[in-house]
Amino acid sequence: MSSRRRKPEWLRTRPPSGRRFTEIKETLRDRDLNTVCEEANCPNLGDCWSGRDGPGTATFMLLGDRCSRGCNFCDVATGGMDPLDPDEPANVAEAVAEIGLDYVVLTSVDRDDLDDGGAGHFAETIREIKRRDTSVLVEALIPDFQGDTDAVDRIIDADPDVVAHNVETVERLQWPVRDRRAGYEQSLDVLRQIAAADGCYAKTSLMLGVGEYAHEVYRTLGDLSEVGVDIVTFGQYLQPSRSHLEVFEYVTPDTFDVWKRVAETEFGFLYCASGPMVRSSFKAGELFVEALERDGLDIEAARAAAERQ
């Protein structure tokens, strides 16, 4: 099924606008910072940046704006890697403070060209944010670091509140969806390592609509639960351009609702954000705090609970 046909009504969004959106964009430009919201053309950009009742969520993309890998679903540019910007950790922390974020998501391109995959730079950014304000919640959405457990530990040791790594799709479809250097078992190993650590929650995300079968999604939820993942999200894959992987199907909102119920009630995930427009970082702060409140936890209690896991 071609993704070039007319999108269903539930996938139509309005372009981002408003004072809050403009303020955040200007702050990012002033500090020459990248966000995955913009680089990957996320459809929720305006919604997340504006927030519903607070300052919202922004996802900063570290280590440059070009990736060393070429996943067939992703709109981030590949190749031509630049040196790391030594001022980026401080600039990100300053932007977080200026915008007034109380929940920030940090992600990065893959940097297989660097000895540590960029883990040290990533970790330093987390520490810079926490140095300025220990109350800011930090979610680190990390690459697989080519299976380097020491690199993953460097992220964990920087004390983020949530560490995410996206498995992206079911095992059968890892290729052609992801770059051949990625792999299902390698991603499960990263998530297992995160889940075994003290003081943070483990999170992952899957795209639907790339040709997966329901029993494969169910099995993937089982695998994720088995390695200790706390949070999972589901969203519709949308083709960034005609040169990218085609959409196999547009999954209905009702189907996304079913997967949310299965994930939370049958597999016991802390929460599952599931919907056609959901992305890994979609309203991450709002949903995380709501999930903690449902469990009767405040932020400090949640951190203590994570340390006891």
Swiss-Prot record:
**Where, by residue number, does [4Fe-4S] cluster 2 bind?**
C67, C71, C74
Task: Write down a Pfam family by its short name.
Answer: LIAS_N
Which keywords fit this entry according to its UniProt record?
A: 4Fe-4S, Cytoplasm, Iron, Iron-sulfur, Metal-binding, S-adenosyl-L-methionine, Transferase
Query: Can you list the GO cellular component terms from the UniProt entry?
Result: cytoplasm
Q: Which cofactors does it use?
A: [4Fe-4S] cluster
- Provenance organism: Natronomonas pharaonis (strain ATCC 35678 / DSM 2160 / CIP 103997 / JCM 8858 / NBRC 14720 / NCIMB 2260 / Gabara)
Using the record's annotation, list all stretches that form the Radical SAM core domain: 53-270
E.C. numbers:
2.8.1.8
Say which family it is in: Belongs to the radical SAM superfamily. Lipoyl synthase family.
The record ties this protein, via CDD domains, to: Radical_SAM (cd01335)
| Positions annotated to bind [4Fe-4S] cluster 1 | C37, C42, C48, S281
**What GO molecular function terms would the record report?**
4 iron, 4 sulfur cluster binding; lipoate synthase activity; metal ion binding
Classification via InterPro entries: Aldolase_TIM (IPR013785), Elp3/MiaA/NifB-like_rSAM (IPR006638), LIAS_N (IPR031691), Lipoyl_synth (IPR003698), rSAM (IPR007197)
- Which pathway does it operate in? Protein modification; protein lipoylation via endogenous pathway; protein N(6)-(lipoyl)lysine from octanoyl-[acyl-carrier-protein]: step 2/2
Q: Where in the cell is it found?
A: Cytoplasm
Q: What is the lineage of its organism?
A: Archaea, Methanobacteriati, Methanobacteriota, Stenosarchaea group, Halobacteria
The catalysed reaction is: [[Fe-S] cluster scaffold protein carrying a second [4Fe-4S](2+) cluster] + N(6)-octanoyl-L-lysyl-[protein] + 2 oxidized [2Fe-2S]-[ferredoxin] + 2 S-adenosyl-L-methionine + 4 H(+) = [[Fe-S] cluster scaffold protein] + N(6)-[(R)-dihydrolipoyl]-L-lysyl-[protein] + 4 Fe(3+) + 2 hydrogen sulfide + 2 5'-deoxyadenosine + 2 L-methionine + 2 reduced [2Fe-2S]-[ferredoxin]
Listed PROSITE patterns: RADICAL_SAM (PS51918)
Name of the protein this chain belongs to: Lipoyl synthase
Q: Which SUPFAM superfamilies match?
A: Radical SAM enzymes (SSF102114)
Cofactor note (record): Binds 2 [4Fe-4S] clusters per subunit. One cluster is coordinated with 3 cysteines and an exchangeable S-adenosyl-L-methionine.
Major site of localization recorded for this protein? cytoplasm
